Amino acid sequence: MARYLGPKLKLSRREGTDLFLKSGVRAIDTKCKLEQAPGQHGARKPRLSDYGVQLREKQKVRRIYGVLERQFRNYYKEATRLKGNTGENLLTLLEGRLDNVVYRMGFGATRAEARQMVSHKAIMVNGRVVNIASYQVSPNDVVSVREKSKKQSRIKAALELAEQREKPTWLEVDAAKMEGVFKRIPERTDLSADINEHLIVELYSK
């Protein structure tokens, strides 16, 4: 599947947030000032219209989860078909992606690294290898690292890094065994308050 291969730090500066979790892996404040717009001197950000604000929020969320436009729109369509709040449904669908779950469990230092692990067949779901990053993990599914991949130093480093993050309450992880259980679908209160999904719903509702 196609994915963005351009300069990621530039995108983070545009959105004003660490989209790709680089700051958790290495210090980036000297190389990339997130509060400044892209450019040598951080060009002044223009004042956005309502549409511009909605578009920026959509782009931010899309890039956080590493999803291209067409796939993101499909997630939104699926969210509208589900019962409940469309915006919250969208976020839970994104959170249920296998690459995101692998990251949340601490097996990958970033979502991009977790996605690579999935595509390289290092991850199993319920004892079977799954190499599709967008695979939707269901409640009670067991996600684990394949035995032959457990010795990879990057996984051990990622688990150490995960100890510094708040542990998701909807997951149960056994770091020693390198496996975890997707206990339940996360609720909105479990997820980042920095995301305004209502803006995305407003954008797609036009």
Curated annotation (Swiss-Prot):
CC terms in the record's Gene Ontology section: small ribosomal subunit
InterPro entries referenced in this protein's UniProt entry, alphabetically: Ribosomal_uS4, Ribosomal_uS4_bac-type, Ribosomal_uS4_CS, Ribosomal_uS4_N, S4_RNA-bd, S4_RNA-bd_sf
Gene3D superfamilies xref list: Ribosomal Protein S4 Delta 41, Chain A, domain 1, RNA-binding S4 domain
Domain S4 RNA-binding residues, every copy: 96-156
SUPFAM superfamilies named among the record's database cross-references: Alpha-L RNA-binding motif
Keywords for the protein's UniProt record, in alphabetical order: Ribonucleoprotein, Ribosomal protein, RNA-binding, rRNA-binding
Single GO MF annotation: rRNA binding
Tagged with keyword Amino-acid biosynthesis: no
Function: One of the primary rRNA binding proteins, it binds directly to 16S rRNA where it nucleates assembly of the body of the 30S subunit. With S5 and S12 plays an important role in translational accuracy.
Family, similarity comment: Belongs to the universal ribosomal protein uS4 family.
Assembly and binders: Part of the 30S ribosomal subunit. Contacts protein S5. The interaction surface between S4 and S5 is involved in control of translational fidelity.
Protein name per UniProt: Small ribosomal subunit protein uS4
Source organism of the structure: Proteus mirabilis (strain HI4320)
Taxonomic lineage of the native organism: Bacteria, Pseudomonadati, Pseudomonadota, Gammaproteobacteria, Enterobacterales
